[in-house]
């Protein structure tokens, strides 16, 4: 009698559920996965090496392109590492703006995740709903930075500029008539803070809509419950962070455990899952959206009442105002040297980590006193999660591999770097 032999299947990299360029080599016994071997590197762009050739500030746009659905949070870790090397004090208003945009970015990420995860599993409506809300948040990005995705808004010592008093307006087109445009621009008639406040008042209702579609849906539960179970002990051993760790029942969140910026002054809860399966991680992320909305509301309230500077007064790090530059020779020299040479960061090393939507995103920067990093190491949260795919998928069906990839919320910009 011939030996029963497992067969091998290539999953991706051209696959709609591969979330970019994931190639999985699956060893199957019938339709049951015996081994899953992730092949990475197809989106490798040598970001760490590129940063060594650029001045400290020129690498800020590279950060946006790591996890390209959580743009500003990537920038935050990078500028925090520079600030620690420089010993810079960031103005409190800039800290609140950063925290507010970190949480807006968390919503952007989680909406992309819930839409694509549901689409992978077979529910299409949520994907369309999620993009409706993302559109408003892209408008917030555009208002402060001029870009809808890759903002490059954070700077060492603060942010690029203060919050604007006007919002970008829609114009009539072939797609929308004037009546529709008027309705769309109604919430955009005031300042950015007015628009964000209006959005935070509407957003809880949208999260309820997603939950109505998914949470008690029996097909959704059949596809997620008891799939990709990870115990708390294994989650710690494998280096899980973020919703992947909290879904296994461990209440670890850098915003609470190692507070940075003004998170210690804000009131929010850390959602923790029970069971460590895909469904628990789904519930954690849905509740995280509600908590992020709470944080944004508190930031809006504080920012309305407290005007002030949004970037450091140290002109060796941040450019002087254009008015000063054109009337003061010393400020002109600062401006010229800053944009030709860049910042000279003192010798030393620093690690800065933020609670990224996907987990702990860290930047380890080493300076030799020059105007560019000697070495930059990026700690991508998705890397540890993807390494656990073999263990999470073993014994499950091929269709469940799609669910497990979705629950990990993988983006290859940060994994391949």
UniProtKB/Swiss-Prot annotation:
GO cellular component: plasma membrane
SUPFAM superfamilies: HydB/Nqo4-like
Catalytic activity: a quinone + NADH + 5 H(+)(in) = a quinol + NAD(+) + 4 H(+)(out)
Documented EC number(s): 7.1.1.-
InterPro entries named in the record: NADH_Q_OxRdtase_suD, NADH_UbQ_OxRdtase_49kDa_CS, NDH1_su_D/H, NiFe-Hase_large
Location relative to the cell: Cell inner membrane
Membrane topology: Peripheral membrane protein
Pfam families linked: Complex1_49kDa
Quaternary structure and partners: NDH-1 is composed of 14 different subunits. Subunits NuoB, C, D, E, F, and G constitute the peripheral sector of the complex.
Chain's role: NDH-1 shuttles electrons from NADH, via FMN and iron-sulfur (Fe-S) centers, to quinones in the respiratory chain. The immediate electron acceptor for the enzyme in this species is believed to be ubiquinone. Couples the redox reaction to proton translocation (for every two electrons transferred, four hydrogen ions are translocated across the cytoplasmic membrane), and thus conserves the redox energy in a proton gradient.
Family to which the UniProt record says this protein belongs: Belongs to the complex I 49 kDa subunit family.
Protein name as it appears in the record: NADH-quinone oxidoreductase subunit D
Source organism of the structure: Cupriavidus taiwanensis (strain DSM 17343 / BCRC 17206 / CCUG 44338 / CIP 107171 / LMG 19424 / R1) (Ralstonia taiwanensis (strain LMG 19424))
Organismal lineage: Bacteria, Pseudomonadati, Pseudomonadota, Betaproteobacteria, Burkholderiales
């Amino acid at each position: 009698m011939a030996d029963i032999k497992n067969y091998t299947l290539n999953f991706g990299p051209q696959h709609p559920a591969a979330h970019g360029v994931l190639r999985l080599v699956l060893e199957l016994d019938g339709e049951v996965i015996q081994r899953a071997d992730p092949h990475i590197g197809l989106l490798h762009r040598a970001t760490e090496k590129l940063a060594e050739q650029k001045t400290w500030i020129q690498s800020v746009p590279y950060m946006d392109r790591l996890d390209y659905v959580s743009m500003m949070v990537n920038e935050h870790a990078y500028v925090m590492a520079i600030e620690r090397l420089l010993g810079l004090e960031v103005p409190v208003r800039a800290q609140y703006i950063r925290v507010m945009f970190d949480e807006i970015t968390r919503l952007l990420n989680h909406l992309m995740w819930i839409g694509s995860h549901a689409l992978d599993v077979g529910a299409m409506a949520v994907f369309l709903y999620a993009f409706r809300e993302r559109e408003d948040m892209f408008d917030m990005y555009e208002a402060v930075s001029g870009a809808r995705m890759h903002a490059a808004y954070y700077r060492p010592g603060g942010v690029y500029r203060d919050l604007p008093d006007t919002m970008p307006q829609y114009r009539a087109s072939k797609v929308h008539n004037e009546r529709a445009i008027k309705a769309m621009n109604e919430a955009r008639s005031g300042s950015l803070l007015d628009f964000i406040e209006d959005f935070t008042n509407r957003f809880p209702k949208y999260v309820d809509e997603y939950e109505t579609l998914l949470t008690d849906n029996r097909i959704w539960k059949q596809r997620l419950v008891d799939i990709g179970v990870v115990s708390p002990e294994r989650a710690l051993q494998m280096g899980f962070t973020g919703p992947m760790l909290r879904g296994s029942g461990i209440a670890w969140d850098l915003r609470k455990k190692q507070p940075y910026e003004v998170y210690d002054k804000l009131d929010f809860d850390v959602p923790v899952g029970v069971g460590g399966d895909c469904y628990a991680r789904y519930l954690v992320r849905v509740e995280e959206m509600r908590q992020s909305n709470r944080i944004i509301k508190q930031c809006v309230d504080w920012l309305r009442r407290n005007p002030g500077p949004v970037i450091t007064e140290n002109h060796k790090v941040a450019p002087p105002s254009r008015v000063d530059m054109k009337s003061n020779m010393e400020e002109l020299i600062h401006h010229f040297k800053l944009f030709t040479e860049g910042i000279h960061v003192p010798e030393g090393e620093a690690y800065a980590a933020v609670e990224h939507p996907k987990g702990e995103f860290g930047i380890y920067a080493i300076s030799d006193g020059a105007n560019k990093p000697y070495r930059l190491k990026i700690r991508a949260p998705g890397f540890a999660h993807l390494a656990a795919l073999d263990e999470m998928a073993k014994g499950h069906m091929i269709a469940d591999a799609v669910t497990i990839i979705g629950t990990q919320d993988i983006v290859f910009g940060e994994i391949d770097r």
